[in-house]
């Protein structure tokens, strides 16, 4: 029998959310490398932040500078990377934040495992569905070139599969339309499910 028990705090998620005037959620941006996940998530965070919302963006590269710096890119390490991020995101949502996470997260099992940690409605899957051909053309880090040469193993979309979501809450192809309209679609969705109050966005415009 474990001696570790959960300590119930006197201040809960609902109280923190009320103080911030928002409903905490996790927006999980998934898609191929170069699909535009970080760009889209960053633009949304900027719009929400400027309107006075309390946010935090977890980025796939950034967490490997600290939280996950001990991990490589084997299947086991990539799974552990996402497990840690999911737990951190859960703590941040409990703190009352609107959390944005931008990770390739190639398998449905990984994403569904993270979704299962949250109450219904608090995990919003955003499939950034930009086609592989466009992602390769962009190749901002030169990774596709290396993967095609065989210099990178288990590279998602080339030598390792990407499992597209079957029922994502939102699907956005960043090769269609402009960034502003894509951010608008995300904000409209968050407004519709009452995560944010649209009057605050209007006031900040």
UniProtKB/Swiss-Prot annotation:
Active-site residues, Swiss-Prot/TrEMBL: 105 (phosphoserine intermediate)
Alphabetical list of HAMAP family matching this protein: Adenylyl_sulf_kinase
Signal sequence region: none
NCBIfam families per UniProt: apsK, PRK03846.1
Example of a GO MF term: adenylylsulfate kinase activity
Protein name as annotated: Adenylyl-sulfate kinase
Enzyme type, top EC level: transferase
Gene transcribed to yield this protein: cysC
Cited CDD domains: APSK (cd02027)
Keywords (A to Z) from UniProt: ATP-binding, Kinase, Nucleotide-binding, Phosphoprotein, Transferase
